């Protein structure tokens, strides 16, 4: 998958969290990583059903249930919802400046520990849609304007992964 090399990192951060919010599910690869971290609650959002990408969300529900974990998949536009307070927010939706800027503006105040961003290399400078700026502009702008957040870890392999942490 386009994220497989980051699975151990996602599990590691997930293990420090009781509540994880994932935005952008696609084929549920990162969802499995977060479930493996065994948080008390995992909520995953996407505009489309994971079956469109070959993922079976029912498998996730069954696995979560068998381990006593609270999992919920919500089909929604993440710019039109209000999330629960969460320890880790993972963003992997539409990889353009405006989308990530708005996701951060809407949801970052609900995040207690970490925000993760996938595809900082593949869609960092140039957005995934022609004519749009990449996500790194939104991340840099957010960090510049919110000094309670700082970069924790950055990986350039497998499309790139960035973890920022709340420091106050």
Residues of each region from the PLM?
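S-adenosylmethionine/decaboxylated-SAM
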Residues: 2-168
């Amino acid at each position: 998958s386009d994220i497989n090399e980051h699975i151990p990192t996602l599990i590691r951060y997930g293990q420090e969290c009781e509540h994880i919010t994932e935005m952008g599910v696609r084929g549920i690869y990162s969802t499995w990583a977060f479930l493996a971290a065994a948080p008390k609650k995992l909520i995953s959002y996407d505009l489309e059903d994971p079956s469109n990408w070959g993922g079976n969300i029912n498998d996730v529900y069954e696995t979560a249930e068998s381990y006593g974990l609270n999992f919920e998949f919500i089909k929604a536009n993440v710019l039109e919802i209000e999330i629960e307070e969460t320890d880790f927010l993972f963003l992997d939706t539409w990889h353009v400046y405006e989308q990530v800027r708005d996701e951060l503006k809407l949801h970052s105040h609900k995040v207690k520990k970490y925000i993760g961003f996938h595809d900082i290399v593949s869609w960092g400078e140039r957005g995934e849609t022609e004519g749009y700026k990449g996500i790194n502009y939104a991340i840099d702008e957010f960090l510049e304007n919110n000094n309670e957040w700082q970069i924790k870890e950055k990986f350039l392999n497998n499309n790139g992964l960035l973890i920022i942490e709340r420091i106050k």
